[in-house]
């Protein structure tokens, strides 16, 4: 059960900004790309040992997609680069009920 001690979570490569946080059922990280073109099933954690299935991360939990789909006013949204959809996020959005 100590396989994660010397290994790291697989992180998607590319220009997309990732938000990594630990998952409750796995010791590896959950990597959440903050760009909308990524599909939901690519946002599930990758574990290096036998662990329970991770929670499903709903689409609104992607930070930039949540901002673009939110009906609440978002100050500074007009300054986003709509070509890259990259924007830092202070608090990672995690699904409830894990």
UniProtKB/Swiss-Prot annotation:
Q: How does it assemble?
A: Interacts with hair keratins.
Output this protein's name: Keratin-associated protein 3-2
A Pfam family name for this chain? Keratin_matx
Task: Provide the residue intervals of the sequence repeats.
Answer: 3-7, 47-51, 89-93
Annotated region 3 X 5 AA repeats of C-C-X(3): where? Answer: 3-59
Q: Which GO terms describe its cellular component?
A: cytosol; keratin filament
InterPro entries the UniProt entry points to: Keratin_matx
Annotated GO molecular function terms are: structural molecule activity
Q: What does this protein do?
A: In the hair cortex, hair keratin intermediate filaments are embedded in an interfilamentous matrix, consisting of hair keratin-associated proteins (KRTAP), which are essential for the formation of a rigid and resistant hair shaft through their extensive disulfide bond cross-linking with abundant cysteine residues of hair keratins. The matrix proteins include the high-sulfur and high-glycine-tyrosine keratins.
Identify the keywords attached in UniProt to this record, alphabetized.
Keratin, Repeat
Its family remark reads: Belongs to the KRTAP type 3 family.
| Species per Swiss-Prot/TrEMBL record | Homo sapiens (Human)
């Amino acid at each position: 059960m100590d396989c994660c001690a010397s290994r790291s979570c697989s992180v998607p490569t590319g220009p997309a900004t990732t938000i990594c946080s630990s998952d409750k059922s796995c010791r590896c990280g959950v990597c959440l790309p903050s760009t909308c073109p990524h599909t939901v099933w690519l946002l599930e954690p990758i574990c290096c040992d036998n662990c329970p299935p991770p929670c499903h991360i709903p689409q609104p939990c992607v930070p930039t997609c949540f901002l673009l789909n939110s009906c609440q006013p978002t100050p500074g949204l007009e300054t986003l680069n709509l070509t890259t959809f990259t924007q830092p996020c202070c608090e990672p959005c995690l699904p409830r009920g894990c």
